[in-house]
Swiss-Prot record:
It is found in: Cytoplasm. This is Phosphopantetheine adenylyltransferase. InterPro entries: Cyt_trans-like, PPAT, Rossmann-like_a/b/a_fold. Its cofactor is Mg(2+). Homohexamer. It is an enzyme of class 2 (transferase). The lineage of its organism: Bacteria, Bacillati, Actinomycetota, Rubrobacteria, Rubrobacterales. HAMAP family: PPAT_bact. Its main location: cytoplasm. NCBIfam families: coaD_prev_kdtB (TIGR01510), cyt_tran_rel (TIGR00125). It catalyses: (R)-4'-phosphopantetheine + ATP + H(+) = 3'-dephospho-CoA + diphosphate. Belongs to the bacterial CoaD family. It comes from the Bacteria. Pfam families: CTP_transf_like.
Length: 164
């Protein structure tokens, strides 16, 4: 079985993330969405809560599962029996850091390949950080996050004080 990992913090999952997951699900036998933590950020929701939101919007994808990932991606990939990491690229600027991470992962787990999927043009500007900022400032995030979690995202990420 050809298993791929789609890792991220998904704080929150965006329509761009979901597009990459859907496209990866057509390329691989099984896709594991690995919900991790970014040590440089303090997420509003726990990894388990973010995973539940992703499960809700990927429920129609039979070959996609969602797991909380703790520790190194390479260790998680080994545990899952995966030899592929799928990453979305929005712009050339994403490539440099993703390339470095892919090289590091390959050093730690030589059998692990990284496959880059170019974001659809309508998602090329989209990031979780932008969604958090728009929601915190009272803006409309419709179309930026999956419809199935729109109200949840509005409630969690909107703040009356405008802080992100």
């Amino acid at each position: 079985m050809n298993i791929a990992i789609c890792p991220g913090s998904f704080d929150p999952i965006t329509t761009g993330h979901l597009d990459i997951i859907r496209r990866a699900s057509k390329l691989f036998d099984h896709v594991v969405v690995a919900v991790g933590s970014n040590l440089r950020k303090q997420p509003r929701l726990s990894a388990a809560e973010r995973a539940r939101l992703i499960e809700k919007v990927t429920a129609d994808l039979e070959n996609v599962s969602v797991e909380v990932m703790e520790g190194l991606l390479v260790d998680f990939a080994r545990e899952q029996g995966a030899r592929v990491v799928v990453k979305g690229l929005r712009a050339v600027s994403d490539f440099e850091s993703e390339f470095e991470q892919a090289q590091l992962n390959r050093t730690l787990y030589p059998e692990l390949e990284t496959v880059f999927i170019m974001s659809a043009s309508q998602h090329s500007f989209l990031s979780s950080s932008a969604v958090r900022e728009i929601a915190a400032l009272g803006g409309d995030v419709r179309g930026l996050v999956p419809d199935g979690i729109l109200e949840t995202v509005r409630q969690i990420y909107s703040r009356s004080d405008g802080k992100i």
